[in-house]
């Protein structure tokens, strides 16, 4: 590590709030699946900014759309119409089959917006008594870090000393349809769930789980809200992760890859029954739906489809999953994944996953640990077979080491 990097990290430590603990690398450039640090070292990005850079770093077509729009008009607020919002609505609706769109910025904003919307639907359409609406969520969830969201987290570090929290949430085990059935009451307005729990360690529910969930929600007039902010837009080898079981959510949340890493853009996708309950002045965002965001998102969606990134995620994800499972390492407890959303869970006695991520950095791989003993792997969807094979070589030599 050069003296300039040491000085840079010292400045961050001195002046920045310590709410993150990054790997000790300072990145300055990216292209496709690759990023470079300030010392000129190249790394294969196996995090993709938590799946926000699915289309690859600095995709030229998205960049061109952003630059062109930035020269024309960037922000109007929603006090006025802009010429990019309606085309954005048309294109995201056509891509996903949605009937109504609420544009926001961050993923957490989309989650908060969905919570407000389904509660309002519960009171005005379903007939739940005022202030009695209940939303069911899952243990080990991660939907964001705003106050409303961390209130129904089960992670002590995420929610500790941030209360008091808003009422109205019931927590059940993830992947347990029987628990959902038992938790539903006449006041239940929604079940908010991730198709795959990413932050928890890429936890995939049992086959058939979401088919049963869909049946239960339909039978009990409960809105199924799928948080596809990480899983959506091709990450799992399908446009939406819900498609693996052939179901359709009532409310779908998108973000991250919706703008290809260039801009914070998120969206709540639903129907008129839910989003039609919102009236002027009841919800909004100065930046949500701005012309720059819409132009960038339109380009990001186009390249995802036109360049076959979703199909590539399925193909390369299968190659990567098989290769990781073939690694014979006593340190590895389980390998799991769907598409290009994967995880290697280590035996506790193998040592902390962060140490393995630091070793991978030394071999030109950037990956992220989560929950102590799990390495998350989520490269951009543009990764090639040769790049997958090279990455597997680095994982093989690293995972066979003992950092206990």
Curated annotation (Swiss-Prot):
Q: Which residues carry this modification: N6-(pyridoxal phosphate)lysine?
A: 256
Q: Which UniProt keywords apply?
A: Amino-acid biosynthesis, Aminotransferase, Cytoplasm, Proline biosynthesis, Pyridoxal phosphate, Transferase
Please give one Pfam family short name: Aminotran_3
Q: Which reaction does it catalyse?
A: a 2-oxocarboxylate + L-ornithine = L-glutamate 5-semialdehyde + an L-alpha-amino acid
Which GO cellular component does the record give, naming just one?
cytoplasm
Its Gene Ontology biological processes?
A: L-proline biosynthetic process
Q: Which PROSITE patterns match?
A: AA_TRANSFER_CLASS_3 (PS00600)
Protein family per UniProt? Belongs to the class-III pyridoxal-phosphate-dependent aminotransferase family. OAT subfamily.
Primary role: Catalyzes the interconversion of ornithine to glutamate semialdehyde.
- Protein name in UniProt: Ornithine aminotransferase
**What species is this protein from?**
Bradyrhizobium diazoefficiens (strain JCM 10833 / BCRC 13528 / IAM 13628 / NBRC 14792 / USDA 110)
| Lineage, highest ranks first | Bacteria, Pseudomonadati, Pseudomonadota, Alphaproteobacteria, Hyphomicrobiales
UniProt lists the gene as rocD
């Amino acid at each position: 590590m050069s003296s300039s990097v040491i000085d840079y990290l010292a400045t961050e430590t001195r002046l920045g709030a310590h709410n993150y603990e990054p790997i000790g690398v300072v990145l300055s450039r990216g292209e496709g699946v690759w990023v470079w640090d300030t010392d000129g070292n190249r790394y294969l990005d196996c995090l993709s900014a938590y799946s926000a850079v699915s289309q690859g770093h600095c995709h030229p077509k998205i960049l061109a759309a952003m630059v062109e729009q930035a020269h024309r008009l960037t922000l109007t607020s929603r006090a006025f119409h802009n010429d990019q919002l309606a085309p954005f609505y048309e294109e995201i609706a056509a891509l996903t089959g949605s009937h109504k769109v609420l544009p926001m910025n961050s993923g957490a904003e989309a989650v908060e917006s969905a919570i407000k919307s389904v509660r309002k639907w519960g009171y005005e359409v379903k007939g739940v008594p005022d202030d009695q609406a209940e939303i069911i969520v899952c243990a080990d969830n991660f939907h964001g870090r705003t106050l409303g969201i961390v209130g129904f987290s089960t992670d002590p570090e995420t929610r500790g000393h941030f209360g008091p929290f808003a009422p109205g949430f019931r927590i059940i085990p993830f992947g347990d349809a029987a628990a959902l059935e038992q938790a539903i009451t006449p006041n239940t307005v929604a079940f908010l769930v991730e198709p795959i729990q990413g932050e928890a360690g890429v936890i995939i529910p049992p086959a058939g789980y979401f088919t049963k969930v869909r049946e239960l929600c339909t039978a009990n007039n409960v809105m199924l809200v799928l948080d596809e902010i990480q899983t959506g837009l091709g990450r799992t080898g399908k446009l939406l992760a819900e498609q693996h079981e052939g179901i359709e959510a009532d409310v779908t949340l998108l973000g991250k890859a919706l703008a290809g890493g260039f801009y914070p853009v998120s969206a709540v996708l639903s129907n008129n029954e839910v989003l039609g309950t919102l009236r002027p002045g009841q919800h909004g965002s100065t930046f949500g739906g701005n012309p720059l965001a819409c132009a960038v998102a339109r380009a990001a969606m186009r390249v995802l489809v036109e360049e076959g990134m979703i199909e590539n995620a399925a193909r390369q994800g299968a190659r990567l999953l098989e290769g990781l499972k073939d690694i014979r390492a006593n340190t590895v407890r389980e390998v799991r994944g769907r598409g290009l959303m994967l995880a290697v869970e280590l035996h506790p006695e193998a040592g902390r996953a962060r140490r393995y991520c630091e070793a991978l950095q030394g071999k030109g791989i950037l990956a992220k640990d989560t929950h102590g003993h799990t390495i998350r792997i989520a490269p951009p969807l543009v990764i090639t077979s040769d790049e997958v094979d090279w990455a597997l070589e680095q994982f093989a030599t690293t995972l066979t080491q003992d950092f206990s």
